[in-house]
Amino acid sequence: MRLHPLVVCADGFSMSVQANGGAYCSPRVEGAERYDAVEIGFPNKSEPLILQYMEGGYSEDGAEPDPTQSVYPYVPVSVVSLVLAKHGGMVGGEVPPGVAALRAPA
């Protein structure tokens, strides 16, 4: 199972973006040429564009969901691209095939 390095954006926002046979993605296979939806995990800040996909993620006291401690299954790649653009583009990490790897301007 291939894991992609953590995505870090120009403004400091970071998240895991995965697609493989064990991830919540579509297609749910290893090494697809292109994915239509991917799994986001554990962003370092709450991101409104992905909140509707949040699963679990409860705080230590169990009272409220914590968006930074959650997995976001089956997020459309177009939404991931919007998140990257909103945060100034990628300065580090890698996204699965099908996600536009929007890089921050040099």
Positions of PLM-derived features:
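Low-complexity intrinsically disordered segments
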Residues: 47-106
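Generic structural hydrophobic/aromatic packing signal, biased to beta-strands
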Residues: 7, 17, 40-42, 80, ...
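Amphipathic, interaction-prone secondary-structure segments
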Residues: 1-34
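Short secondary-structure subsegments characteristic of cysteine-rich extracellular domains
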Residues: 28-51
